[in-house]
């Protein structure tokens, strides 16, 4: 969080597409309540440590190319267990973005997500200190 501005800034980090699939799937009611709570903040972000490609290709993306090559039957069985599709995840995220004004940023990995988060904090810190 940004010291002194915890009341106006909220950054929610998501480590994997599986995490967000769980949030908008099995835990949707809880996650919707969390989005309602986040809506009270002036500046709100969901920082994703994965790509838009991961969302679009979910659930196929959860297995590496090597895994698909060496154990295709296993991959297919595991994917068949999933009830959530990438299309559904994308729809849910775009609804949160549209309805609650939450900025959703796809950063590809944890390192990039950290850099993006730091950059957001720097911009907000500059803005807040110019206003005081």
Predicted regions, residues:
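Conserved catalytic cores of phosphodiester-cleaving nucleases, focusing on short active-site segments
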Residues: 9-15
